[in-house]
């Protein structure tokens, strides 16, 4: 295929006239102000798009051959700058430092050293008349003042500082409009209806070796000594040029007959195919008549791929002035065999809302330096927003201006920002502080690589063979084929530190993300409606559950996920989903998640065990109720409810439901509460198992108070009166062996007494048998205390007898009767 020398484009002067007509103002002695026009719509080809005015103001540096300066001065508003010079083949052997003044605060920035600009078109485009060399750009933000110092042994001629005002407008919302790339439909004028351009239609295809003017200069300031790769292959390996290398697509013969009849329409689901004639040749009021011809030979429409195009902001979306670029179609390669990752080296001090302005600024600088268009094929900001770069159809193998000598059959993705760490392979020519690339940026780069390499059938983790197309690229030999990683850093194809150590270190991640299969796929939980419930190493649910999972591969690189139950897919969801509801039959199951990469490759998680439990809990020990210890009154007699609940898979919770509600633990077997005297009380319980199944149980009891007056007395007893006593009275005795005997029928009994520091002790007999001795001594006085209880499995007639012990120094005991439960 043709290099930058070919293609159906207008001659350089023709585009230049269009540019000048857009509003160029020549400033004597200081440079040129170039006004650009840019649309600010959201990516559709709407009629009458708004205009975003973008301008480049060039100010000349003056001084000696080894020192050029621009004194601190006020300027028109700008946000980006770069320093450029006349000959792009001459490297700036020296240091360029700039500082800018904030238009918001009036404060001057610190001095910043600019590195060399290392994204370049191939020789045919670079060596056109009027093309300039330049430094890396600097995003300064809103500014209205600048100062520049350039020092070196011999500085290039024609040094200027180029100040870019990108205007306001553009969108950060992806809007892929396939209609903007549609081919002429039936009934419209086709390429064969138009005259062909004699300058291009019959021109033989050019190769880099056809240009005798190429030379071999030394590397740029940012060059590393060898273009090494941190992962295999360690460096590009020379091989016979006829070999395509692993994972490559052999190029078609340039002499093969190619039909010029395009398809009638573009794929509605695959944006960015060959642009229409009206898009390639925009209607510009000042443009001279240019024959509108399709590319010849017509590039093949990219093959279909499972990988869908990622969302991206179109050129119209970010505000590209299509009348400023070279009119017509760009040059095309055969297919994209390799992706080169770059950074713009413009600093990271930007907001993502600035990204359209940054892209327009880079576009303006590249045009100002004489390039036919923006050099990069795509740009990505730190928020992960993707911007379409060079015109020609995002899906097409557009030859960019990004990796000198290897622009054909590759594409360049530029990460907006600076990602150096100034160690190892990073050049220290620039003092711009680098940062680590964001996860969103790495993900977006991976997404583009997956799409573009997917159309070529090249694995992102594989390699491709590219042939060096420049005679003067340091470290590479013209005409030799080199094996490159399918996802490479700019430094692997050119002597530069780009894309910076911090981004370069992420290329293995990019390869893995782009190639698939999904990594880190695992089930994180299987939830019941109230959340996940574990039982041992597995989960317990009912017949409905929610399966949740995670992956280390970002969601935008997944096309979908499935939940497998016992190996069968039961739920399919989008790649962005991390959960799905499922229905299960009763019993034990295995659950897995299968995630699908955009490439179609899949990964199935390890299985987790899930038991769908539909069986209610049981009560192996039915509830029973007994009298308990504590303070007694007619409204509340202490009782204790006892039971045992169980479930094959385990209990989640238990609760009391009557006569009062109370939350109990899953392991509870008793519940102390109270019951109203002389009233039948129902004590209700609920047990809930891990799956949410419930069971209920209850028991009913009626407590009755028998006062001391109902007992048979022996010895001396004294009646005491107080509102603190049950019924207002109690009986006391300090006589040793004095006794009270109650006869009752019931299943539980409690003896009630008063306590004080002077209280004595009693012996308790049931049915004539000594049960225990109870000492009533207490540091604090307490009335109506159930001090001792005894229960039976069923109600029967019994006797309870208390006998005064006659404790030395404190013989007196006071009793308030007994409580009986039936």
Where are these regions (language model features)?
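Secretory targeting and sorting signals
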Residues: 1-40
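Basic/polar, cationic surfaces and motifs that engage anionic cell-wall
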Residues: 2-17, 163-251, 256-340, 382-393, ...
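Glycan-recognition surfaces in beta-rich domains, encompassing non-catalytic CBMs
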Residues: 45-143, 151-152, 165, 596-598, ...
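Solvent-exposed loop/turn segments flanking beta-strands in beta-repeat/beta-sandwich domains
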Residues: 92-94, 553-565, 646-660, 754-764
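Ser/Thr/Pro-rich, low-complexity mucin-like regions
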Residues: 141-174
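Secreted/periplasmic proteins that engage bacterial cell-wall peptidoglycan
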Residues: 328-397, 464-467, 479-489, 728-737, ...
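Conserved aromatic anchor
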Residues: 546-554, 639-648
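Short beta-strand segments within Ig-like beta-sandwich modules, predominantly Fibronectin type-III
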Residues: 569-576, 660-668
């Amino acid at each position: 295929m043709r290099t930058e020398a070919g293609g159906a484009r207008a001659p350089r002067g023709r585009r230049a006239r269009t540019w000048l007509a857009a509003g160029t103002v020549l400033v004597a002695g200081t440079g040129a102000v170039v006004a650009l026009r840019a649309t600010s719509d959201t990516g559709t080809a709407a009629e009458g798009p708004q205009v975003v005015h973008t301008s480049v103001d060039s100010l000349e540096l003056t001084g000696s051959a080894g020192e050029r300066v621009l004194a601190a001065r006020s300027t028109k508003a700008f946000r980006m700058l770069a320093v450029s010079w006349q000959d792009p083949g001459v490297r700036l052997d020296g240091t360029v430092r700039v500082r800018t003044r904030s238009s918001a605060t009036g404060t001057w920035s610190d001095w910043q050293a600019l590195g060399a600009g290392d994204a370049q078109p191939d020789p045919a485009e670079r060596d056109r008349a009027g093309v300039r060399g330049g430094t890396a750009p600097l995003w300064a933000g809103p500014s209205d003042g600048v100062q520049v110092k350039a020092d070196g042994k011999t500085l290039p001629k024609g040094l200027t500082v180029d100040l870019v005002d990108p205007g306001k407008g553009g969108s950060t919302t992806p809007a892929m409009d396939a209609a903007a790339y549609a081919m002429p439909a039936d009934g419209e004028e086709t390429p064969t209806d138009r005259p062909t351009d004699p300058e291009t239609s019959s021109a033989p295809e050019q190769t880099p070796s056809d240009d005798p003017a190429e030379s071999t200069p030394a590397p740029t300031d940012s060059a590393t000594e060898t273009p090494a790769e941190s992962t295999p292959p360690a460096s590009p390996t020379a091989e016979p040029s006829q070999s395509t290398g692993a994972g490559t697509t052999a190029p078609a013969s340039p002499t093969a007959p190619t039909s010029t009849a395009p398809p009638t329409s573009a794929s509605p689901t695959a944006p960015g195919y060959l642009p229409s004639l009206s898009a390639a040749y925009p209607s510009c009021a000042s443009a001279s008549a240019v024959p509108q011809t399709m590319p010849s030979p017509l590039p093949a429409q990219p093959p279909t791929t499972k990988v869908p195009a990622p969302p991206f902001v179109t050129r119209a979306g970010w505000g590209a002035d299509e009348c400023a670029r070279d009119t017509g179609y760009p040059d095309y390669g055969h297919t994209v065999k390799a992706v080169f990752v770059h950074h713009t080296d413009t600093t990271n001090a930007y907001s993502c809302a600035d990204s359209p302005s940054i892209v327009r600024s880079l576009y303006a600088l590249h045009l100002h330096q004489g390039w036919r268009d923006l050099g990069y094929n795509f740009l990505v900001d730190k928020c992960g927003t993707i911007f379409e770069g060079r015109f020609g159809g995002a899906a097409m193998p557009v030859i960019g201006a990004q990796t000198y000598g290897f622009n054909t059959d590759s594409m360049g993705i530029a990460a907006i920002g600076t990602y150096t760490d100034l160690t190892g392979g990073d050049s220290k020519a620039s003092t711009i502080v680098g940062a680590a690339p964001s996860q969103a940026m790495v993900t977006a780069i991976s997404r583009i690589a997956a799409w573009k390499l997917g159309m070529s059938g090249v694995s992102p983790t594989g390699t491709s063979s590219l042939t060096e197309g420049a005679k003067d690229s340091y470290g590479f030999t013209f005409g030799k084929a080199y094996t490159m990683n399918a996802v490479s850093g700019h430094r692997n194809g050119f002597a530069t530190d780009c894309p910076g150590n911090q981004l370069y270190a992420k290329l293995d991640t990019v390869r893995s993300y782009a190639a698939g299969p999904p990594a880190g796929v695992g089930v994180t939980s299987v939830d019941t409606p109230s959340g996940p419930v574990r039982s041992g190493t597995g989960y317990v649910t009912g017949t409905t559950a929610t399966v949740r999972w995670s992956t280390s591969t970002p969601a935008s690189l997944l096309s979908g996920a499935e939940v497998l139950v016992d190996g069968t897919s039961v739920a399919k969801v989008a790649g962005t989903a991390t959960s799905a509801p499922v229905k299960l039959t009763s019993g034990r199951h295995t659950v897995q998640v299968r995630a699908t990469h955009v490439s179609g490759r899949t990964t199935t998680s390890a299985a987790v065990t899930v038991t769908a439990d539909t069986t209610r809990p049981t009560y192996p020990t039915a509830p029973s109720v007994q009298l308990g210890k504590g303070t007694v009154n007619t409204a509340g007699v202490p009782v204790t409810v006892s039971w045992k609940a169980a479930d094959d898979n385990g209990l989640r919770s238990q609760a009391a439901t009557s006569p009062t509600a109370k939350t109990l633990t899953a392991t509870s077997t008793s519940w102390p509460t109270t019951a109203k005297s002389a009233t039948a009380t129902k004590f209700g319980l609920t047990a809930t198992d891990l799956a949410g199944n419930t069971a209920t149980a209850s028991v009913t009891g009626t407590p009755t108070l028998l006062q001391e007056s109902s007992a048979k007395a022996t010895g001396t007893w004294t009646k005491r009166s107080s509102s603190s006593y049950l019924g207002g009275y109690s009986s006391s005795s300090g006589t040793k062996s004095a006794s009270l005997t109650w006869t009752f029928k019931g299943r539980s009994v409690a003896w009630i007494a008063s306590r004080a520091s002077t209280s004595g002790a009693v012996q308790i007999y049931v049915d004539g048998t000594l049960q225990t001795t109870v000492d009533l001594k207490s540091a604090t006085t307490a009335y109506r205390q159930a001090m001792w209880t005894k229960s039976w499995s069923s109600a029967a007639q019994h006797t309870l007898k208390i006998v005064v012990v006659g404790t030395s120094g404190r013989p007196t005991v006071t009793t308030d009767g007994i409580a009986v439960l039936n």
